[in-house]
Amino acid sequence: MWLLGLQDDGSSLLTRFLRPSGIVLAVLLMHAFRKGYQVRKKFQALKDEGIPIMKHSMILGHLEVVGKLVSSLPSDAHGDYMMMKIRENWRELFPQCTKCPPVAYIDTWPFTPPMVISLNANVSSQFTQEHSLPKAHEQKHVLYPLTKNQDLSSMEGAKWRAWRKSLSPGFSVQTITSRIPDIVEEVEDFAKVLKSKAGKDGEWGDVFSFETATTNLALDVIIRFFLDVRMNEQWGKSSALCIALQDTISRMYFFVNIANFIHYYNPWRHFKLWKNYRTLANTLTPAVQRRMDALQKDRSVKGKTLVDLIVQALDAEKAEQKVMTQDNNDHQAAELDANFVTMAIGQINTFLFAGFDTTAATLSWLFRLLYQYPEVLAKLREEHDTVLGPDAWGAADVLRRDPQLLNQLPYTLAVLRESMRYHTNVGSMRRGEPGFFLVGPPGSGPGFEGKNLPTDGFIVWDGNFAAHHDPELWHRPGEFLPERFLITDPQDPLFPPPNGWRSFSAGPRNCIGQNLVYLEAKLAMALVVRCFDIECAWEKWDLKK
């Protein structure tokens, strides 16, 4: 009887385990089918309203269409290339349209939420400038491991406005110009690193990853600018801070779906993210504490770094909270201090992330274009000879003595802006709202012109990469023509269109750090382009790998 009872108990235990598991699985499947049906119906409703969309299936949505569209791209190609593929193939994808549609509704559920991508700069201005939609939940979700969403990018409303106002002085032209000697020192190291890799006596050096070099430069510059500390990443002295930052970024997921959820929920990933955050916090907290101690001693002294501004803003916020609560007990103070540190670390981390990742990519594309277009490179070198003097290796000393010379390089700035048009970083993602509609701009063709285009339940994506290659707005968009940014006559076909250039987004939530990017890129050109010849060597790189 006892043995029989034990076997019955085991069977009963298994049954008790499997039954609720089966119920949970059934509920999840029912929820997934229900969600999928709702998403697919959402797109069918667009068709019923007469809004042109790509060929859509109630079973696969746009998965088959998008799959074919991106099949020619490398497996690790950035998602931005999808919008370029849509623009390039619009006649096949939208046979009912007479011109490229201003927006494309995309249904790739369950891999991504429903999206509407703006392919037209005038449409993008509607949700970033005329009315600034809130950031997409996914954009906040991806930052959480790095910032706990205590950062300017994740904030909304009054809190965002207060922080934007507090931090803006740190990115003003005056502040950034005052830091030119510091940044020159880091960019000078960039030139020295490239020199160490160059060949001798007119020979080519060994092949290397230029993106690695620009990434290390961007890390050194951003940390020097924000913390006033030299990291020497360019010389291979990888710090715990930079290792933790880059490892965290490599483990970020914008969309969590059936293709990556195992990796996303992997306990090792979460342990590494926790450990990386502790490393970042432990490294940055002393800098925050030093500034706080200095502020307590003398509040009249204003610092020059981002940390200074963050601490000053948090100190003012803390003082205001004390006045409002009239509660100065020790427990409350300790609690505020913990929040203080979390907010400070969150703000710093988001700027470290945004400041190096996009800048490194910008510099890599910039130098590639320069050496693809020798006539542009020749004009650039000529401008540098004229303004900075004929000694290419002495340009750093010239700029230390007279930083304002950087403002006398109009062609250099035009080259940068055209490079950022030609190869554009990721556009802003916003969250659609009930009652907010995009409106098809004049001339956008049947089905779009003047029509209300719903955003509720959609991620609204500024497809600036595609918009920058819109032949309706940009004359000769497939050509690299820096001269277009020197033209002042609005009647000239090359004149940049209003709202057309969106590399830093536009509107109240445009990139707060754009002046720093301008400075770093102009310095990189000023100190490098006359010193080296550079070419792509993919075959040699493949052999080396």
Regions found by a protein language model. Give the residues of each.
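N-terminal membrane-proximal hinge/A-helix region immediately C-terminal to the signal-anchor transmembrane segment
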Residues: 2-148, 153, 158, 162, ...
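Conserved, non-catalytic sequence blocks in retroelement Pol enzymes and Pol-derived host proteins
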Residues: 49-51, 173-177, 297, 403-410, ...
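Conserved cytochrome P450 K-helix E-x-x-R motif and the immediately C-terminal K′/meander segment
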Residues: 71, 76-95, 99, 397-449
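Cytochrome P450 heme-thiolate monooxygenase catalytic core
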Residues: 136-144, 178-363, 379, 384
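Cytochrome P450 I-helix active-site segment
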Residues: 180, 184, 204, 240-247, ...
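C-terminal, well-structured subdomains that either form a transmembrane helix-short loop-helix hairpin
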Residues: 343, 347-357, 362-364, 443, ...
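Cytochrome P450 heme-binding "Cys pocket" and the immediately downstream C-terminal segment
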Residues: 374-376, 497, 514-545
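Conserved cytochrome P450 K-helix/beta-meander segment immediately N-terminal to the heme-binding cysteine loop
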Residues: 462-492
